[in-house]
């Protein structure tokens, strides 16, 4: 009788255990990204209350159609991003923050998206009433440094808007 049992399972099991241990150790010691500074709570509540509904009026429906046309089709992502870029700049001129925020989240290039969201923030920061749109723009940014700078600006602008009121 032959007692050759299958013993080849020990080495792969040990290998998996070592890999799992390394992954766990790295995840524990890896520094997480710092959370951006918080925006003032009343401003955040105003931003959370915003509902984007481009179907609410005829002009919004036209913006929605332009955005859908620019973001779809068989063209290269760079071309789609360029078309969305034009739509965002045009909608910002007309102070249609709903259209500009909708188009901005569809941009695939992270650096372009962050730059355009910063532009939305800049335009929204010119008036106290449009400041909540800046919060939406800041939350759409992917770069943590840009997001921190945006939150700091929002806090500053909110303070200017409410200086003598509190």
Model-predicted segments: where are they?
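Non-catalytic tandem-repeat scaffold regions and their flanking low-complexity/translocation tails
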Residues: 10-166
């Amino acid at each position: 009788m032959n007692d050759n049992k299958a013993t080849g399972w020990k080495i792969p099991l040990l290998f998996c255990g070592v890999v799992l241990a390394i992954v766990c150790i790295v995840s524990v010691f890896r520094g997480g990204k710092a959370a951006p500074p918080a925006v003032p709570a009343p401003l955040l509540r105003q931003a959370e209350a915003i509902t984007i509904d481009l179907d609410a009026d005829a002009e919004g429906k036209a913006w929605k159609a332009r955005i859908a046309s620019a973001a779809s089709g068989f063209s290269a992502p760079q071309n789609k991003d360029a078309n969305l870029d034009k739509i965002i700049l045009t909608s910002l001129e007309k102070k249609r923050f709903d259209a500009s925020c909708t188009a901005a989240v569809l941009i695939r290039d992270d650096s372009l998206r962050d730059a355009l969201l910063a532009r939305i923030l800049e335009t929204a920061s010119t008036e106290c009433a449009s400041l909540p749109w800046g919060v939406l723009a800041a939350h759409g940014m992917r770069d943590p440094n840009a997001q921190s700078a945006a939150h700091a600006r929002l806090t500053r602008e909110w303070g200017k808007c409410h200086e003598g009121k509190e």
